[in-house]
Amino acid sequence: MTSCSKCGMIPSLEETGTFLFTAAEAGGRDLIIKHLKDRGAEPEQEGRTIHVPFYSLEEAVRMVDGLEADLKESGVSVKGTWKNSASVFGHMLDLAVLKVRISKPSYLKIINEGLFTHHMQPIINLHSSEVMGQEFLMRPDSSTYSFYPGELFDYAQKADLQSVLDSQARMSSIEHSARHLDQGTKRFINFLPSSIYDPNHCLKSTFKVVKEHGVDPSDLVFEVVETEKIHNVAHLQNIFKTYQQYGVNVALDDLGSGFATVEMLEQLKPDYGKVDRSLISYCDQDEEKQEKLKQMLKRAEIHNIKMLAEGIERKEELEVVKQLGFDLAQGYYIGRPSDYPMGKSFTTAGK
C-alpha cells in the first residue's frame, strides 16, 4: 500500500496507548489540557501536541466523547490521533472523525489488516451460455471478525477510511481471482471513485498487485459501485482513462437507477453497462420496462458498449433480456455468490 495519508497504513487500536491532541491556538490547547485534567487524565504537552495515555478501549472512547462534548461550544477546532505500543502514528484527524474511528476497534482492525474474503457471482454470455466472468463481493473472512459489507463501508466513510478499505478490497479481489480463476475469465471488481483522488498515484498499488500475481489486465473489469454518487464526471472520466490505458476494462453499474443514467453511459463510454435490477425485475410482464430496455440497448450499441442485465431471479426474465439483445446476465437464477466459482457453462436444467 502507499504511504499517503489517504490510503496508507493506519495504527491499530490496542487496549492501551497514547492519544495525541492539538489545536491551532494556544488557548485551545489550554482548554484541552484543562478538560483532560478535570476528567482525571494525565496530559503532557510537547510543543503544540498534547500527549495523554489511555489504559482501556472503554477509557479511550470516553475520553474522546467527553472532549468533543465539552469543547463543542468553545469554537476550538481540535485534532487528534493515537500511537500504540509499536509507536505507529496516524495523521491528525478532526475530533468527530477520530470519535467514529475508535468507536469500532474490530472494524478498524478488519480494514487495516484486510480481514475479509470474497465470494464470486457468475456472469454468463447470453449467446453461448458460458460463464464469462465473476463479480467479486466482499464477505467476512471468519466468524471472529463478522460484519455486513454495507455497514463496514458506511463506517469507513464516516471514519475517513474509505480510501484504505477500497484499496484493500481491490487488491484482495485481484489476489483472490488469481487463485481461483483461469486466464480469460473476466473479474468484475467494484471501486469508489471518491477514494481515488489522483488516479496515477492511487492506482499504483492496484497495478502492482496485478503484475505480481500474473493477472492479465484485459481480464479485469472495474465497476463504479451502486452507492457512489457521481459528483464529478470529469474525475470519473480520468479514472476510466487511467484504467483503460493500463489495458483494464471499466463498467458503469446500476444503469437506470439514480445517478447512472443512459446519458451518463454515453458520456463516460465504459466497456460494460450493467442495468439495474429495478428495470429487470418482472420485465416479462411490463411492456414499459421492455421499451426502456430496448432504447437503452440501442444507445449502447452506438458506442459498442456490452450490456449486462443484473438481478435475474426468474427464467422468464432471462428469456426476455436474451430476446431483447443483452450480451450478458447475472443474478440468483443464474448463480448465487459462492466462495468457489461456478462451472464453465450455465444450464436451465432442473431450474
Segments (PLM) and residue ranges:
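Structural preference for beta-strand elements that scaffold enzyme active sites
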Residues: 117, 135, 186-188, 219-223, ...
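Glycine-rich beta-to-alpha transition loops that act as phosphate-gripper elements at the mouths
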Residues: 123, 253-259, 306-315
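Catalytic core of bacterial c-di-GMP phosphodiesterases, primarily the EAL and HD-GYP domains
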Residues: 163-235
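Catalytic-site-adjacent helices and loops of nucleotide signaling machinery
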Residues: 149, 158, 252-265, 318
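Conserved, mostly hydrophobic/aromatic
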Residues: 129, 169, 173, 189, ...
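Active-site core of bacterial EAL-family cyclic-dinucleotide phosphodiesterase domains
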Residues: 95-154, 337-338
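Surface-exposed amphipathic alpha-helices with a cationic face
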Residues: 210-211, 237-249, 294-301, 322
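EAL-family c-di-GMP phosphodiesterase catalytic domain
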Residues: 1-90, 94-99, 130, 226-229, ...
